[in-house]
Amino acid sequence: MKHLSRFLCLLLMLALLLPGALAEAVEQTDDDSEDITEKVGDIFDMYQVGSMVEANGKLYTISYGPTICEYDGENWRIAVAVSSFSDVLRFSEDGSFYSDETSAVLSVDEDGTLLMLYPYSDGVIDLLRVPLDVSDVTRVHSFRLSEDSADEDGSLYCSLQGATLTGDYAYVTAYGLNPEAMYGLNQLFELNLKDGSVRKVTEDYIGVILPLDDTSLIGYYDNRYTGLTDDPLTALVRINRQTGLTDTLCEMESDSSFSGFTMSGTSVVFNDGSQVLRVAAPYDTVETIGYLPPAYVYTNLPGCVSGNSYYTYNYDSGLTSIDLTAPLPATVLRIDSSISWGDAGDLVRQYAKEHPEVGIVYASTSASTAPDYTQHMQSGEALDLYSFYLPGDAFAALRNKGYLAELSGSSDLLAAVTEMFPNLTKQVLVDGHLYALPVEVSTSCWSIDTAVLEDVGLTAEDVPTTYLELLNLIDEWITSYVEDYPEHALMDYPYSLSMQLFSQIMMAQIAECEADGRTLTFTDADFIATLNKLDSMREKLQAYEDQWSDDNNNGYVTYSSNAVIGGSYDTSSEGPLLSSYASIDIHYASNPESTAVPLMLSIQPNHDSSIIGNIRVMAVNRSSKNADAAMNLLTYLAVNRSDYQKSLLSPAYTDNIEDPYYEETKKSHESYIDELTKAMATADDSEKRDYQEAIQNLTDALTRLSPYQYTTENILLYDSQMENVRIIESTVFYGDDNEASTLVKRYMDGNITVDQFVRELTRIVQMMIMENS
């Protein structure tokens, strides 16, 4: 009975959290004789994908389980199911070691059988023979790389970084066997496939390895992340199999990462997430031979050449094949790699797939100031599309000096930006002239938990509307409420409280001046009163912060998720009154269980609140020879945004946003209810109550299920909050050798008073105004 109850509870969790998971489980248990090796599906929906090889004219890869998947050029199927490995894999009863199938490496034996090097965290690597005719998987050898592969507490952590099989030997690089080694320093071992012996060859910053000839290997060398060198090197190196000595063959770009290494004949083929690259004998030059839908690169992801195509897998773009005989595109756009993530990155990949005539390469820049960008835009490393965060000083300076192309020529692009929240676009859309496309917005604000407010006897009238009222509430809580209400914390994660509050007060004052159209000033009475209050609380805030830190380190601090509108949190039955890491978002506005609301704060009483926002914008380098193609890409990004992304940036989109998983989830719930109802009909009377409870819970969940991910009501609430977001334009605290920033440090270090700070800051602002005039 107890076991049945737990089982039904597990089924219910699967039903609510993993649509489709239980249906598959039920389907497979209905008929144990079902040949699951013939199931066809897109296995690259899975997050983890390992080594990839060609055998018998087909492509094989390792996925979670382990599972061997086969691709025949059109469809994927599971060629070797996880159950085939159950008798040969090692399993730790006490959890002292674990396996890592996505670091396993496939090779092909002379008879077409797959060979697999399968690693474990305790330094053991099994050589498995994996037939493709549903015969048993067998263990050929079990290699132990080191007898001493544990740290002081006995836990094991060996991690396989690279491996290759060639002739009678396998070579592997592993990290973690030397507890004193710096990050990236791997040990290279030779495994004798005939007698099962192990020989350490060398220790170096080499990860991926490939066979070169009878005496040498090719390795990917990367010492950039050691922190021990002023001369970072990323290169292909030749490794002597006997001595381990290396010599550099071909240096590669130090700002890039690489993955998908494979041999094609005598050439090394790999990618940087954007380009397919080849290094041919004598291995001294990197050449581009194709372009991928660009994505972020993880070094250990697989690659394989099959026929005329290069196959690679990436977590963001899935499986991609590139015809290596196709001509290279005439236009290649270099764009800022900072947008390779998220929705913008997805749209860039989508554009690349739809426009093979345009190659897209992600590249980075260390520029942060206008002079830095100016120099970069005129160099050989210049980008066609740059990304900027606002607020900041570089974008406005480059815009005003004519370094950014005007984009108003694209009517679709202009229309998309014109309909966005005007408080977000003031710096990119100036007097009808468009200079950039906003692609991302983020905010930071305080929130207050109304449930905690009620618990401690406070009312809506006690909710702060100014920063001075917020400081008074914090002061009162620390003074009076801490002892009276120990079950509630004042706030979540109070790190650097004085500096955090000071920065928010300064930004709010700037935002209010800009919103009012006033000359920037720091002499307003309300501002000075707020700053004086903060100054008087600094020691008290530090003491509270120190006490909170001690409690947190001792495990005494946990929070309820209902108390947070964003940011991080722990979970328990109680929540804090305040969160300093809240944000404005449709997702949080739509959370029906949240008892937290954002605080709309101002400096002046009865003034519109100012929530400080940040936006990422994309702008075209005016000097680019591909400016038109870059503008076409920006137009594509603007027009093809999802409904959710449009709603985030524009008040014009308020329609309900459909949940793409609604029908699947609904069918799954109905299927679970049907299966449980059938099972209940033949269950013992003692079990029926558990079935009824599980069915009722699923029925309730089905009733609550909505076809909409976000409703018009959610979006309108978000829109009303976004009206208070400000992207400040003042650059008083930005730029190198900034005098105002130096002044802030002197004040926060306690070297000057509030009056001295205000007086000096006023002088700096007046000088800036005179210079700009």
Across the structure, where does each feature detected by a protein language model lie?
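Extracytoplasmic/periplasmic substrate-recognition and gating elements
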Residues: 590-670, 678-681
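Conserved N-terminal structural module of periplasmic/extracytoplasmic solute-binding proteins
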Residues: 24-69, 163, 176, 207-209, ...
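Extracytoplasmic/periplasmic solute-binding protein
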Residues: 435-439, 444, 468-532, 570-577
